[in-house]
């Protein structure tokens, strides 16, 4: 089944798709209505806040009826003179999938280099577009998405060799650096000084950064060291690092060229609890984002003067996203406030004032009234006594104890699920659902210690947290015990797979999106692109203790004879991270072993990868099926 082009696999997939069509035929009118609700959101036009870089302001816009954004620029002295940088609607013509990887403007501001994925498999092609003539030239393919200019050349990551390769517009190429450890991935980017290229080698446990200046040699910032992770920002007159060398929850450090030993770095003591998750620098000031118990705080500091001032703190269900500082008429910091129940707002801090001012915000659907919805944060005890947070959103009104509860989690790699307004949640919220994000161990919501307590030989904590929070919510009067549903994507799909085996009666409906469910077998295959890095997170099956632990929870291996709930699997044919065959054989095994009459379906996207379809209407179709499957599975009338 691994070879999806094998005739037997082709026939099997066709039968699976036919079965899906047959089973969902009675829901045709429900699906049509749900699609109509979801597609109504696509009429909203979206435009980003201009960012000043060099002599231009850059911004993007999605217009009504268009699938993709158009990226524009205009001279900062002539704001009405608009020029197209990249039109993704034009570039995507003739493809069933299109994703922009990254783009960068040349030092002379005459050419844009960009990478694109036209199949969903994660392989990107490097192309150049002349901004005066509009002529597009293809340079190289089978690349990672990141890129950076180095003089007249473009640096990109060659996937097959895991190398930084310098490409000239005429097609010549030179390998500058090759990463030999398969556990490490490479990325490149242009520094804030707009001259230096930053080359990062990173695994789940360590970082190593090199820089490349115009006409110079590769310079090592700090050699890789087990457990040391760091990020680098280079300005015109400074180098600033965010590092966990001195503090597990990260600290800022200032360094001089040649200081490759972190013990020589000058660390700044931020007198606040929590994790430093991001920062920006403008002139002598730093804007620092600190996260403590799910609350983000923005702190403005002058490290030379020892000055430190809190600017803003988020509430429940909110987060900050720092933006590149503005070099316009009123220079200063910019950031976004994201909320689960309010469209994104953008703010600016003019350094001379040291106060945040709202500059614009996204539009809400025409019939959306924020005051009708509520966000709550609860901290609930897991079975080992650890308090696990969950963020809930719902529409005000009926008693919460009588409502359907739909939970989600991720819980791996120290990654947090995004906190942002999503109008596609409204169909469920308006039908009375309580939606919840469970911030399980293994994720990054509460810092590195939270991540480490849910990885490797602590992985069971991730799954137990999810089950325990669901039970505690119902016990506290949130959610009807017979109307619980859950979803998870990728590593979050592992959570769903374990829950299906270990707590099959708790949730009536489960949704697993591109799920990682054959954990043990996948980690045993060294030919897969992510195996060497993933064993640092999940464990090494060549180590007996790790193999036993993995076997005891790996969803596919632990399918057993019992009554399973309704399960919808969403799979992508071109998924380069989690093979579609995992989901297919997992569902087949559940159907074979299940003693109940619940429905197990697989929804296969033919033209997408791990992150799903790029076509907005196809994304809504997938979402509509998910919502109707959950509604029908819970026995609700729609």
Give the location of each predicted region:
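Active-site-proximal cap/loop segments of hydrolase catalytic domains
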Residues: 440-638
């Amino acid at each position: 089944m691994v070879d999806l082009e094998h005739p037997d696999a082709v026939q099997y997939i066709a039968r699976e798709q036919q079965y899906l069509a047959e089973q969902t035929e009675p829901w045709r009118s429900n699906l049509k209505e749900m699609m109509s609700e979801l597609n109504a959101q696509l009429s909203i036009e979206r435009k980003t806040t201009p960012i000043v870089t060099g002599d231009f302001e850059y911004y993007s816009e999605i217009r009504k009826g268009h699938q993709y954004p158009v990226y524009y620029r205009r001279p900062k002295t002539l704001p009405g003179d608009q020029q197209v940088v990249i039109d993704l609607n034009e570039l995507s013509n003739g493809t069933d999938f299109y994703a922009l990887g990254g783009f960068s403007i040349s030092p002379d501001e005459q050419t844009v280099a960009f990478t694109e994925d036209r199949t969903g498999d994660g392989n990107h092609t490097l192309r150049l577009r002349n901004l005066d003539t509009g002529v597009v030239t293809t340079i190289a393919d089978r690349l990672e998405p990141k890129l950076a200019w180095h003089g007249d050349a473009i640096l990109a990551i060659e996937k097959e060799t895991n190398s930084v390769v310098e490409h000239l517009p005429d097609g010549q190429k030179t390998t500058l650096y090759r990463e030999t450890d398969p556990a490490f991935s490479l990325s490149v980017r242009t520094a804030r000084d707009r001259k230096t290229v930053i080359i990062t080698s990173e695994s789940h446990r360590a970082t190593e950064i090199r820089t490349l200046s115009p006409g110079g040699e590769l310079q090592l910032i700090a050699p890789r060291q087990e457990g040391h992770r760091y990020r680098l920002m280079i300005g015109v007159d400074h180098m600033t690092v965010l590092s966990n060398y001195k503090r597990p929850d990260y600290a800022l450090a200032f360094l001089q060229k040649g200081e490759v030993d972190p013990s020589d770095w000058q660390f700044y003591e931020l007198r606040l609890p929590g994790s430093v998750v991001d920062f920006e620098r403008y002139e002598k000031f730093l804007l620092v984002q600190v996260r403590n118990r799910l609350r983000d705080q923005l702190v403005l500091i002058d490290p030379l003067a020892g000055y430190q001032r809190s600017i803003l703190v988020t509430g429940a269900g909110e987060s900050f996203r720092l933006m590149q500082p503005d070099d316009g008429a009123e220079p200063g910091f910019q950031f976004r406030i994201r909320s689960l129940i309010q469209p994104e707002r953008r703010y600016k801090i003019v350094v001379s004032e040291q106060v945040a001012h709202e500059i614009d915000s996204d539009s809400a659907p025409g019939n959306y009234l924020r005051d009708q919805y509520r966000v709550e944060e609860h901290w609930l005890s897991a079975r080992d006594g650890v308090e696990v947070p969950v963020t809930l959103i719902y529409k005000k009104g009926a008693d919460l104890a009588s409502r359907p509860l739909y939970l989600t989690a991720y819980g791996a790699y120290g990654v947090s699920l995004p906190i942002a307004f999503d109008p596609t949640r409204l169909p469920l919220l308006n039908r009375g659902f309580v939606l919840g994000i469970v911030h399980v161990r293994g994720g990054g919501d509460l810092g590195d210690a939270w991540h480490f307590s849910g990885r490797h030989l602590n992985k069971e904590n991730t799954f137990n947290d999810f089950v325990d929070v669901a039970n505690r919510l119902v016990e506290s009067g949130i959610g009807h015990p017979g109307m619980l549903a859950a979803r998870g994507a990728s590593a979050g799909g592992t959570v769903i797979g374990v829950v299906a085996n270990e707590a099959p009666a708790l949730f009536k409906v489960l949704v697993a999106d591109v799920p990682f469910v054959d954990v043990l077998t996948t980690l045993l295959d060294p030919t897969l692109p992510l195996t060497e890095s993933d064993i640092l997170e999940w464990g090494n099956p060549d180590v007996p203790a790790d193999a036993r632990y993995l076997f005891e929870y790996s969803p596919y291996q632990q399918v057993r004879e019992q009554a399973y709930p309704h399960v919808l699997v969403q799979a992508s044919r071109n998924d380069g991270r989690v093979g579609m065959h995992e989901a297919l054989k997992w569902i087949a095994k559940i159907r074979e072993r299940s003693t109940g009459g619940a429905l197990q379906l697989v929804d296969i996207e033919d033209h997408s990868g791990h992150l799903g379809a790029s076509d907005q209407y196809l994304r809504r179709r997938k979402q509509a099926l998910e919502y109707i499957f959950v509604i029908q599975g819970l026995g609700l009338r729609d």
